[in-house]
Each structure stands twice: as C-alpha cells, then as structure tokens.
Amino acid sequence: MGKVSANNQSGFFKFYIDTALLLNAEFISSFTNCINSEYNGKVKISYSSSSQQFKVIVYEEHKREAFSLFEEIVQKLKRESTVYKKPRLDIHPFGQLHYDFTTLLNFQRYLDLGYGIEDVKIKENEDIVKSKVGKKPTSSDFYIPCLIKPKIITPFEWEGNFKQVIYSPTVYNGSFKRLFYLPDNNDLLKEFAHATNTKYKASLKDNKIVVLANNDQDINAMLEKMKHIENLVSQKVYEYPEETLVYAGKIAPCQLKFLKLKFENEILYTAMHTTSIFKSVFNILGSFYTMRLLRNKHDGDSYELVPVFAKNPSKTPPCNDNFKIFSDDIKLIGCKIFAGVSLNFSSPKPAHRFYELNKTSSNLSIPVLQKPSNFHSSSTELSDNSIHQGRRAVDPVVNQNNPSNFEEMIMNKLNKLPTIDKQILGTSSLTHFQDKTTAIEHSINKSNSKQPPRFKFQLPPRPTSNTLPLEPEEELVTRYSVSSDGNTVDEAITKQSQTFQLVNSNEFNEVNANDVHKSLRQNCAKLDFDDSKSKNLLSVECLELDKGSDCSTPKSGSLTPSIDMKFLRLQDEKMDDLGDNYYTILMSSNPVSSYGVGSLYLFQPKIVCSEKYINHEEIDNMNLKSLHRWLSRSLHVLQSFSGEIELNLEFGVILYPNISSDVSACSHGFMNIYKDLNLPRSYFADCITKSVSNIDSLLNTPVKILFGRTEYTYPLIEHEVLDSKNYFVFKGSLLFTDDKRNKTEDSTVFFSMICSSKLDQFAFYKDSKQSSTCTINFPLALWDSRLRIETKVPLNDAILTEFSKSIRFRNVNKDLLLVFGNMEDRVIIHSVTRINENSVPFNKNLLPHSLEFILKCSKVKSYDISPSSINSKEAFVCLDRSKESKPIESCFSLSIQSVYMQSQFKYNNSIRAGETAPWKLANKQFIGGAITENVSDLYTAAIIMVNQLGGIHPTI
C-alpha cells in the first residue's frame, strides 16, 4: 500500500510505503541508513514500527524528481527485501493483504497522462480520489489510492443511558485497523457489535475503540471477541491444553489423545481409532465395543468401554481400495524371477533397468511345480487376499510320509529349473538388488556428494548404523505338520511372495441378538474372573439410554448386557436409539479381530454437536488435505535433527472442533498459500484417516505451492520403490542384571526386537522413553505444530540372542505359526507385529537443496500371543488362519526418514558438535538457511515457523 501527499507549505513531499513484509529491526536499520546515505540532501527515510510503514520525505528543491526518487526507493526496497526474505503474502489471518509493488508506481501513470505536480486535475473517470472529506483538492494536495481502501468509522450519537469501556490493542503492536477491517470491505467490529448488541466509536488516530452498551454482560462479550482476534493475530496461544487419556482395550499398544480448545461453545474431543482395540475375551461372533465419554464435575473426564451388539445393520461399510503405490498398475513390487536373463548392475538407474526387464517378463516361461491336493489354499503372506504367485509346491503323488522321498523329489524338481543368477534369486522388488551398493545407498551417496547452493553445510560421513540389515528377500519357509505321535513331518516348501496388497476387508456378520446373548452367557460361565482382563471388562457400564431401551448394568460374576442398537453412521441425523442424552460424533467400522466387528465410538452431549459436522465425508476430506499439507511441511523441518530418528504417523480418525463463525473465517487467511486446497478450518493441522483410499489419494495428490505470484504443482512422492522389507517386531521386557561394585541389581528393560522374515537376522533396541518435542513459531497461520522425535538405542544382551534362536516357523492344522520360547524367567514378549514396508522418495522439487527424504509406507499386522499346548515353555502367534476365521485387521503407517537426520547440521562452524540449530524465529541459519536463499519463497519461510503441529504420533 502506497500513499503520497505533497504540501508546499511544509516545504517537502511525504510518501508512505506499507511494505507488507515481515522484516526485523536489523534489516530496517540497514536499509534506512543506506538510503539516507545514498540520497543525502534529497531524501530522508524513516520507519514507524507502530504503523509498520516507511515514510519517505523528498525535499522541496527536488520536487520535480520526487516521483522518480520514490520509484527508485521502492525498487530498492523490493530488491533488498527479496534477498533478505520474500514479501509476506499474508499479514492478516482473515484475508490476503498482499499489495503489488506496481500499485505503488501508479503515480508514473498519472504523469504519463500529462498531469504534473502543479497542474494535477481531478477527474471522475480516474482513480484519484479526494484526500479530505468536503474539501476540494488542490494541485499540491492529492491522494493516490491502492488496491484496498480502509474504511472510515464515523462517530455516532448514542441515545439514552449507556455504559462504556475504552479498548486499545495491548498484545498486538500495531493499529487496530489491521485487526478488524478485512480486505473484502467487511468490518468485524460491525459484526461483533451486532452479535453482542453493542455500539462503538473508533478513533484511528488514537488507536482506541469506545465500546458502548446497556449492560456489563454485552460489553464483556464484545471485549472478549476483540481480545480473541487480537490474540490470534499476535500469535498468542489461546489456551490449548493437551491431555492424554487412558488406554482402551489392550493397554500396551493403544492410545487415545485429544486436544481441548476453549471457545464460546463447550469443548469437543479428538479421538483416534486404532486397530489395537482388541477382540472380546468372550470370542462372540459379531461383538464390538462402544466407547463413551463421561462427564463428572468432581472426577473430571473419563472413558468407559461398553460392549454393544449389532443387529441387522442397515449398511455394510465400504471396502477400501488398495494403495496405488503398491498396485500392479504402477509395477513397483512383485518382480518375478527370470530365467536366462543377466542384469547389468553397473547401471546408475536400477529402477529403470528393472522396468525394462519387467516388459520382457511376459515372454519368459518358468516351470511351476504342481500344488498337492491336500495343501491348504490360504496364503501366509501379509496380504489379506491369498496370493499364490511364485509358490512352489510338491507333486500330489508323492508320499509325504517318507521324508527322504519327499526331499529327493524336491531336489529333482529344483534341478530341472534353468540356471538363475544368484544375485537375481531372492529379489522381491523392482529396485532392490543384493549388491554391496543398494539402490538406497546409491541415492544417499549421491545426496552426500552434492553441495547445497550458496550455503555451507558440513555433514560428516554417514555413520555406521547398528541396525542389522533386514533383507527383503523372498523367503523359503518350511511348513511342518504335527502327527499324533508328536513327530514333525515336512509337508511342503513354500516360497513367500513380497507383493504388498493392502486390502482391508470390512465385512461383518449379521447375528441374531438372542443367539449372541445366549452365547455370551454360556461363555461368561467359563470365565475366570480373577484374570486381569476379565476385571477390566467387568468394570464397564452400559449406556444410559431412553426408557424404551433395554440395558442392564453388568455385575460382578455375570456380564449380561442387553443392548439392542442399530449400526449407526455419521450421516444418520436421527439417533432414536440414543435418545436425547448423547449424540454420536465419531463412528468407525473397521474390524479389529477375527471374531467380529470392532468399532470405536465417541458419544457427546447433543447440545455441543454442530450440524455441519454430521457429514463425515467432508471431515475426511479436510483431514486428508491437512495431513497432505503436514507431510509436505515436515520434510523441511526434519533436516535439523541429528541422531537416528524416525517420525511416525499412524492413521486414525480425528474430528475438528466446533469453532465459532468468526474463528472459522480465519482459515481464509492462508488460502493464498494453497489456492486449490480448502484447508481445514481448525487451529491444528493434525489429522488423519483410517481409510486406505484416502492414504492412496494422499500419496497421489499433487502439492500446490505459491512462489510469489506463480503457482507450481508437484507430486508428493516419486513413483519409485527404493527398498522393500518384510520383518517381524517383537516387543517385550527383559530382566536385566547389572554387576557393579560387587552388588547385583536386577532391573526390567523394555525392548524391541526386529527380526527378518527369514528369521536369520536380528536387531535389538532399548525402548528409550527419551523423546524431544520441538515447537516452532508460525506467524502466518493459526495452527500450532509439534514435532515429536524418538530415538533408538541399540541393546546387546546374551539372553536376547538366545531367545532369538528359539524363533521358528511351524505348521499345525493348516495354520502357519511363528513359535518362540516362552522364557518367563528372563524374557517376556508382550506383542508381535509383522510389517511390510516400502520406501519411496519424496519429490526433490519439494525439498530445499535437493535433500533426499524417504517416505516409508507400511502395513502393520498385530497378532495374538497364545501359549503352546505342545510345549509349556513355548508360545506362538498364528500367521495364517484358515478360511473359517477372518484375518486379523492391518493398520497402515507412514514414516519419514532422511540421511540428514543421521548427521549434524552446522552453519559456518558456529554450532558445536552435538548441537543443533537453535529454535529461534530470528535465527537466519535455521533449516539450512532456506529463508536466506531465494529458493522457496513464502512456502519455506512458513515451514520453519510452525508452532506445535503434533498430536497423535504412535510408533509401531
């Protein structure tokens, strides 16, 4: 915004420049000194921090060249500020206040039309307006307008008695016109006054507002709204306490977290649905639980887990699609073994090489062994669908009771196969090869060899990781069958494919309520109520339904709730079954066990639910876009950390708070950053979805970034798989003995053990609770951001090595089991999960200085741990259930990694070893000096200043 006024009586011309820039005191001082020195005697420039304007004074003797001097100064300011930092595109959360610098040069347009300093004429068809109301402008007194004209508040007369309070901004250092006057000519003060039945008098000169009302209540309401907006614009945290609730279901892996936002309405809660809500101990088909929130003035807030039974559900939840990144259309994973084809491993682009081979795969013939008639058809892969491609089975005519004949037959079959390159044998993805230099190492070495432009990075050599490499080879799993005499007999040698198909079967059975209740009572009679799990379930209470609903509170010794509910959905407007007590805010319908449907519901009082949040599809869309923006921003922030770090996200469902209309309008402030992304109208950008299709959409949705006035579109990731892994994760506790000073002390250490899918490589980590939380200020928007960093500490102990040797595969009753020693005296296993992980690179166009970040897309399956009936010292998990049982549900996770997180960030040797860049807003070397480089404009500047974006970041 530029304003020029000339006054011959005062002897000089005055120009005012509203820069719309985010500048610090150092730059302002340097720029003003430079201009005053260069134009000494002609121009004097000063800066007002209150109005955030440059005032340029041109002396009388140089009035003829006043406009040319002003143009030169504006161009210098534009050029210098661009080098220091890009123009701030958004200085107000309610709308775009970015003024084009060409507007400031409109004076030259009037000069080109023949108007001089002494003979300026006012015409109705021109954009020149009067500077003073009721006074005809003279040749020496004129006003040049800009894009947006501020409103002028005229005083008014109040009739009758009234109370008044004088308000002026206290937190915000600037004029209140920037707070309450929007660029679309909307006046927030007028809207607030209408909503609170008040009136006001505004004085732009004194920067004060006089609030008038008939009572104190209306005045306080008006003041609260104005202070609220002032806090938002000044980026003050407005009461965002964060709380972590108790675990629901199985305690160890499940966590519920919510953000409490205090506004005009009552608080709403954010809940995350996780697959860790385990099955019922009653093993009843079709059973699931409902979680509700209890409000107690004395005890606070608490959750209760209530068993609920579905009867004739009206709708079946839609099945989720596969990830496109793992589908066959893109041809990323599932490389076949070729015969008679040699690979050139010297090629710098392994992915391109495998793509070429994939085109010729259809012309190659591979001998396939016949499958025995008594071989079960269910797959042992992670995929929910049975995939038999690449399996090797035996001839049905072979007598499998004779191990020697069976082994001889297998060897004969294998000898008939063509000769296969050893380096080709065992590959499971198109970009993975067993060489000393893998594809991922190649990309890391390439990244380390690059020097960031015009910025001094000092990165030490890549540290040697204690993590054992987990080769994603296609494994040969020996299946066993146990005869009646206890002898194990080889049944078949099967090869397990690494094809990653993310199929989530959302099916559930319609059961009769009476049959369920009858079965429930029968199973309750068999329960051991001394068991801790039974006690947890017996402590729950039923929902307080209407009088017409049948609900009995469970009592000690018998749990017989008689709850008859319909399967409610978010879009259901009528909640007849719940009555007037509760309103269903969140409903999810993903199965959590092989015995039925598991759903996590959140019930809220009906009075606090907004009608606009009933449509869950809109909420899902906002969640997806929010996560999309969060991921793209996180890439820049992560490079400042040192150590072995992983930032993880697990997908759930999050609701947005029921915010008021004035706060909702704030979301339009950062619309100009992503024009086509309707960002969620919320203060936190955290949120995620359980839907596989939404994750697929996330990975394939382009990121739109605004560079100055030009918008660029980049895909979030590159469709190239750098690495693929399939491994198990055991989590447990170890009784650790430490001998110091002849004193033996026993302590329990919680650990994680990563085991390759072939059970031949292991890595042990101590579950360190040391985690750091980094908060980053973000002045351009209203959300907070928090990055939670957790480190891994290697753990070496002989007892864990001994335990790892006890892990093996076994086939019992057509079910593939993973058996391990139950060493309760030293090692106790709490959970077992299987992870299929693919690593894909982010688009380098989104990264500063071509840093190579990797996105890891994983499918995680959790299993039950059951004691072995054959050997009391063993336990097992069932990896491949028979067709009669439904597969255990999988969850999907994303993690971000970079080689720069394993090195030290430095800037001109000013940061010592073991330190990272200070988290300060004015630190220009922060995030690799991205804001000092002309590379990413506002986008990069925004990324380095986000304040507390975290929320739910559970690790696997």
Swiss-Prot record:
One GO CC annotation? pericentric heterochromatin
Lineage: superkingdom: Eukaryota
Molecular-function GO term, any one: chromatin-protein adaptor activity
Q: GO annotations under biological process?
A: regulatory ncRNA-mediated heterochromatin formation; siRNA-mediated pericentric heterochromatin formation
Q: Tell me if Amino-acid biosynthesis is a UniProt keyword of this record.
A: no
What's the main place this protein lives? cytoplasm
Q: Which UniProt keywords apply?
A: Cytoplasm, Cytoskeleton, RNA-mediated gene silencing
Describe what happens without this gene. Answer: Leads to sensitivity to thiabendazole and microtubule depolymerizing drugs.
Subcellular localization is given as: Cytoplasm; Cytoplasm, Cytoskeleton, Microtubule organizing center, Spindle pole body
Described purpose of this protein according to its UniProt entry: Involved in RNAi-dependent heterochromatin formation and centromeric silencing. Required for the conversion of centromeric pre-small interfering RNA transcripts into small interfering RNAs, histone H3 'Lys9' methylation, and the recruitment of the RITS complex to centromeric sequences.
Q: What is the recorded name of this protein?
A: RNA-silencing factor ers1
Gene (UniProt): ers1
